[in-house]
């Protein structure tokens, strides 16, 4: 009986830790569609970048990497969970998609959000003549 119980717990533990997170790369039209459904867009760039280019209206500014490339994943997740309905997921946004790809992989590894939508960033947004607003 004990052996069956221990085996059951091991089985449950192993399968409970399998990542159900999903990373999906999306384009600008999909960004707009998902935002219209209430999925938050998290702009992970630095303040100097927001000031320089502007930001997407109704996005959330939460820097991930500082100017030295350092980050605090736990703090970032705590901030994002305050604004995200974890069922719907989050949209990550940076300059070119490079930073958000790294962040998405880190979030997937620990199953922080069920869905992480990765974008091509501000450069692709700008090239498609999409609207930006002044950072305030």
What role is predicted for each listed range?
Residues 2-3, 19-28, 33-37, 47-89, ...:
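Rhodanese-like catalytic fold shared by cysteine-dependent sulfurtransferases
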Residues 5-15:
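Sec-dependent N-terminal signal peptides
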Residues 92-94:
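Short, surface-exposed ligand- or partner-binding patches at beta-edge/loop junctions that are enriched
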Residues 41-43:
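Structural scaffold elements adjacent to functional motifs in cytosolic proteins
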């Amino acid at each position: 009986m004990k052996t069956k119980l221990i085996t059951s717990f091991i089985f449950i533990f192993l399968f409970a830790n399998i990542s159900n997170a999903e990373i999906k790369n999306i384009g600008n039209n999909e960004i707009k569609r998902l935002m219209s459904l209430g999925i938050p867009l998290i702009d992970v760039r630095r303040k100097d970048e927001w000031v320089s280019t502007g930001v997407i209206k109704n996005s959330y500014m939460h820097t991930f990497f500082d100017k030295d490339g350092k980050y605090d994943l736990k703090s970032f997740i705590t901030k994002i969970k305050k604004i995200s309905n974890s069922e719907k997921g989050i949209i990550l946004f940076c300059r070119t998609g490079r930073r958000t790809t790294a962040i998405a992989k880190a979030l997937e590894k620990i199953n922080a959000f069920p869905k992480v939508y990765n974008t091509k960033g501000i450069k692709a947004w700008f090239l498609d003549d999409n609207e930006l607003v002044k950072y305030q």
